[in-house]
Amino acid sequence: QFNARVWRNPRRRRSDRYELAMLVNEEEVLPPSDKAALKRFIRAGRQLGIRVDQIGRDAYTRLGEYDGLFIRETTALDHHTYQFARKAEQEGMVVMDDPGSILRCTNKIYLAELMQANGVPVPPTAFVFSDDDEQIDRLIEELKLPMVLKIPDGSFSRGISKVKTREELAASLRA
């Protein structure tokens, strides 16, 4: 004879109205949100009746189990975060950072033109499309040395260099 009594504690019934996947990478050196902020997001979700699950890049196939996606990793177009955002949007989920925002915000040329068009003060800016001597002379005349060079799709200080001389400028543009 078997005992009909349940030998384990039954799971608490879920009363969450929504389930949100929060994409994180615990190995990231400079994440957009630290561990304390992630805990606060989870607590705030609980107070609103939203279950927040931290997921990693290995959860791509399970993304459809959720109502929304909140990306708390550094995003880039050639990164799994962009693929997650696209899939979530295609599945009709609420997505923060959505693919369109990732596309726009990772493009410094787009952002610089947008700010200038809307009257937002920005440092003197020039876009470089070649590394020939004529271009180098134009940059020095227009912006003066020293200057800061940035790649158009870098983030968190990656792809940034300060140049003080014409030689450093030429070497950085040719690198």
Where are each of the predicted segments found?
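Active-site nucleotide/adenylate-binding loops and adjacent lid/helix of ATP-dependent enzymes
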Residues: 1, 13, 17-24, 86-92, ...
